[in-house]
A protein has these predicted regions:
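Non-catalytic structural scaffold of enzyme domains
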Residues: 1-169
Length: 169
């Protein structure tokens, strides 16, 4: 059986890409370095701002950049792709139509894990970009898992969240 090669479609921000690689490495049971999973990362910080695209309706440049980066991973041999950017998941359906490699839905997996950890009917706090909130990605995924999403109730809190998320990362 050949090994599965993981692709990381990253750069949004670069530290998130590095953090995912570290987490994959730390969670892989390995007695020697050869036991680790093969991971290919394309950290492309030139992908346009996802929140701006969602709020302005100019989504095609983001879709094109995500697809180009995913195709790079596909050509490099990735057999599954992960995207360590919540807001980029608003473009997941479009991206899946443009590449053959399966792409993990981080939002869906988060909702499944929340249900497993806290049980159906639980309330889940949600801090996210304006774009992620507007698309209701997490709200819908959590509702499908019979959970309730609650985001910031005051604009000042959401502004503070955005200030934090907009820092260089």
């Amino acid at each position: 059986m050949s090994e599965k090669i993981i692709g990381i479609l990253g750069g949004m921000g670069p530290e998130s890409t590095a953090e995912l690689l570290v987490r994959i490495t730390k969670r892989t049971p390995a007695a020697v370095e050869q036991d680790h999973l093969r991971v290919i990362a394309d950290s492309n910080p030139k992908i346009p701002n996802r929140t701006d695209a969602l709020l302005d309706g100019e989504m095609q440049p983001v879709i094109d950049a995500l697809a180009e980066t995913a195709r790079n991973l596909e050509r490099a041999g990735a057999q599954v792709i992960g995207i360590p950017c919540n807001t980029a998941h608003a473009f997941l359906a479009d991206l899946r139509e443009l590449v053959a490699v399966p792409i993990v839905d981080m939002v869906e997996q988060t909702a499944i894990e929340a249900r497993s950890s806290f049980g159906e009917g639980s309330v889940v706090g949600l801090l996210a970009t304006d774009g992620t909130l507007r698309t209701r990605l997490y709200h819908e995924a959590l509702e499908e898992c019979r959970l309730v999403a609650v985001g910031p109730q005051h604009q000042g809190v959401q502004n503070a969240v955005m200030d934090t998320l907009d820092t260089v990362k």
